[in-house]
C-alpha cells in the first residue's frame, strides 16, 4: 500500500462524487496540498480549486474541494495502511516489540508525508509514531550503507544462513 493507491482513491472519488476526471499528477497534487489522514478542525476547511474534465460533457470544469472531503476520499486506503501496521505489530517478536514501544514507529517513504498520518497511526496503535528526518531518501540511503558495508546487514536483519556464510568476517 503506497502513495499511488491514495492518489487512485482521490481520482476515483472525484469521478464518483463530482463527475470529474483528473490525471495521476493532479490527484497527487491534491494529496500533497490538502490531503490529511487525521482530523484537524482548522485544516479540514482548507480548500483547493481543481480542474479536470467533466465525465458527462467531456468539457473542462473546476470544482472546489476541502481537506476534510479529501480525507474521506483517502479513508479506505488509510484504513488498509493502519490494518497492515497492526498485523505487522501482531507478528513482531517480543524483543522487537519492546523496542518499538520504547522508540516508536518510524515512517519512511512518500506516504510518510501525508499530513497527519503519524497522528492516525499513533491514535490507532497506541504507539508513538514519528516521521523519518528525510522520508523520501532514508530507505535508499540505508540500503546504500548496507551495500557499502555488507556486514552491516547482519546487525539489521535476521539473515538466512547462506547469506551469513557469504558475509563472514
Identify the role of each PLM range:
Residues 1-75:
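Phosphate-binding glycine-rich/basic clefts of nucleotide- and phosphate-handling proteins
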Residues 73-100, 146-149:
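Phosphate/ATP-binding catalytic cores across multiple sugar-kinase/actin-like superfamilies
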Residues 23, 42, 145, 149-169:
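Acidic, glycine/GT-rich loop-and beta-edge segments that sit at the periphery of enzyme/chaperone cores
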Residues 20-24, 89-97, 153-157:
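Active-site phosphate-binding and catalytic loops of NTP-dependent enzymes
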Residues 119-145, 153, 160:
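Conserved phosphate-binding/catalytic loops in two-lobed NTP-binding clefts
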Residues 10, 85, 107, 143:
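Residue-level signature of catalytic and energy-coupling elements of molecular machines
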Residues 60, 65-70, 95, 99-106:
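Glycine-rich phosphate/diphosphate-binding loops and the adjacent beta-loop-alpha structural elements
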Residues 97-121:
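Glycine-rich phosphate-binding loops at beta-strand->alpha-helix junctions
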